[in-house]
Protein backbone atom coordinates (compact mmCIF):
# COMPACT_ATOMS: atom_id res chain seq x y z
CA UNK A 1 0.00 0.00 0.00
CA UNK A 2 1.68 3.18 -1.13
CA UNK A 3 -0.41 5.49 1.09
CA UNK A 4 0.12 3.64 4.36
CA UNK A 5 1.26 6.77 6.20
CA UNK A 6 -2.26 8.23 6.04
CA UNK A 7 -3.16 6.01 8.98
CA UNK A 8 -0.59 7.79 11.15
CA UNK A 9 -2.68 10.95 10.74
CA UNK A 10 -6.22 9.51 10.60
CA UNK A 11 -7.31 6.49 12.60
CA UNK A 12 -8.68 3.65 10.43
CA UNK A 13 -11.83 3.58 12.56
CA UNK A 14 -12.52 7.12 11.34
CA UNK A 15 -10.99 7.11 7.86
CA UNK A 16 -12.53 3.93 6.45
CA UNK A 17 -16.14 4.93 7.21
CA UNK A 18 -15.44 8.39 5.78
CA UNK A 19 -14.09 6.91 2.55
CA UNK A 20 -16.99 4.46 2.21
CA UNK A 21 -19.47 7.22 3.02
CA UNK A 22 -17.94 9.50 0.39
CA UNK A 23 -18.19 6.75 -2.24
CA UNK A 24 -21.84 6.11 -1.33
CA UNK A 25 -22.71 9.81 -1.48
CA UNK A 26 -20.97 10.18 -4.85
CA UNK A 27 -22.88 7.19 -6.24
CA UNK A 28 -26.19 8.61 -5.01
CA UNK A 29 -25.44 11.98 -6.60
CA UNK A 30 -24.61 10.35 -9.95
CA UNK A 31 -27.75 8.22 -9.93
CA UNK A 32 -29.95 11.15 -8.89
CA UNK A 33 -28.46 13.21 -11.70
CA UNK A 34 -29.23 10.47 -14.21
CA UNK A 35 -32.78 10.09 -12.95
CA UNK A 36 -33.54 13.81 -13.11
CA UNK A 37 -31.81 14.60 -16.42
CA UNK A 38 -32.74 11.62 -18.60
CA UNK A 39 -35.97 9.92 -19.55
CA UNK A 40 -34.58 6.48 -20.35
CA UNK A 41 -32.85 5.75 -17.01
CA UNK A 42 -36.03 5.63 -14.92
CA UNK A 43 -37.66 3.45 -17.57
CA UNK A 44 -34.62 1.16 -17.51
CA UNK A 45 -34.86 0.75 -13.74
CA UNK A 46 -38.59 0.03 -14.00
CA UNK A 47 -37.92 -2.71 -16.55
CA UNK A 48 -39.64 -1.04 -19.48
CA UNK A 49 -38.39 -2.01 -22.94
CA UNK A 50 -36.29 0.46 -24.87
CA UNK A 51 -38.00 2.50 -27.54
CA UNK A 52 -37.46 1.12 -31.00
CA UNK A 53 -35.65 3.28 -33.50
CA UNK A 54 -36.76 2.94 -37.10
CA UNK A 55 -34.10 3.72 -39.67
CA UNK A 56 -35.44 5.41 -42.79
CA UNK A 57 -33.79 4.60 -46.09
CA UNK A 58 -32.50 7.65 -47.96
CA UNK A 59 -34.71 8.85 -50.82
CA UNK A 60 -33.33 8.41 -54.30
From Swiss-Prot:
<feature type="topological domain" description="Periplasmic">
    <location>
        <begin position="36"/>
        <end position="60"/>
    </location>
</feature>
<dbReference type="GO" id="GO:0045156">
    <property type="term" value="F:electron transporter, transferring electrons within the cyclic electron transport pathway of photosynthesis activity"/>
</dbReference>
<keyword id="KW-0042">Antenna complex</keyword>
<keyword id="KW-0997">Cell inner membrane</keyword>
<dbReference type="InterPro" id="IPR002361">
    <property type="entry name" value="Antenna_alpha_CS"/>
</dbReference>
<dbReference type="GO" id="GO:0042314">
    <property type="term" value="F:bacteriochlorophyll binding"/>
</dbReference>
<dbReference type="InterPro" id="IPR018332">
    <property type="entry name" value="Antenna_alpha"/>
</dbReference>
<keyword id="KW-0437">Light-harvesting polypeptide</keyword>
<keyword id="KW-0076">Bacteriochlorophyll</keyword>
<dbReference type="GO" id="GO:0019684">
    <property type="term" value="P:photosynthesis, light reaction"/>
</dbReference>
<dbReference type="Pfam" id="PF00556">
    <property type="entry name" value="LHC"/>
</dbReference>
<dbReference type="GO" id="GO:0005886">
    <property type="term" value="C:plasma membrane"/>
</dbReference>
<keyword id="KW-0148">Chlorophyll</keyword>
<keyword id="KW-0812">Transmembrane</keyword>
<comment type="similarity">
    <text>Belongs to the antenna complex alpha subunit family.</text>
</comment>
<comment type="function">
    <text>Antenna complexes are light-harvesting systems, which transfer the excitation energy to the reaction centers.</text>
</comment>
<keyword id="KW-0460">Magnesium</keyword>
<dbReference type="GO" id="GO:0030077">
    <property type="term" value="C:plasma membrane light-harvesting complex"/>
</dbReference>
<feature type="topological domain" description="Cytoplasmic">
    <location>
        <begin position="1"/>
        <end position="14"/>
    </location>
</feature>
<keyword id="KW-1133">Transmembrane helix</keyword>
<keyword id="KW-0472">Membrane</keyword>
<keyword id="KW-0479">Metal-binding</keyword>
<dbReference type="InterPro" id="IPR000066">
    <property type="entry name" value="Antenna_a/b"/>
</dbReference>
<keyword id="KW-1003">Cell membrane</keyword>
<keyword id="KW-0157">Chromophore</keyword>
<dbReference type="GO" id="GO:0019866">
    <property type="term" value="C:organelle inner membrane"/>
</dbReference>
<feature type="binding site" description="axial binding residue">
    <location>
        <position position="31"/>
    </location>
    <ligand>
        <name>a bacteriochlorophyll</name>
    </ligand>
</feature>
<protein>
    <recommendedName>
        <fullName>Light-harvesting protein B-800/850 alpha chain</fullName>
    </recommendedName>
</protein>
<dbReference type="InterPro" id="IPR035889">
    <property type="entry name" value="Light-harvesting_complex"/>
</dbReference>
<dbReference type="GO" id="GO:0046872">
    <property type="term" value="F:metal ion binding"/>
</dbReference>
<comment type="subunit">
    <text>The core complex is formed by different alpha and beta chains, binding bacteriochlorophyll molecules, and arranged most probably in tetrameric structures disposed around the reaction center. The non-pigmented gamma chains may constitute additional components.</text>
</comment>
<feature type="transmembrane region" description="Helical">
    <location>
        <begin position="15"/>
        <end position="35"/>
    </location>
</feature>
Amino acid sequence: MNNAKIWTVVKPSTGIPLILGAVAVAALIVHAGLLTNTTWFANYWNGNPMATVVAVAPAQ
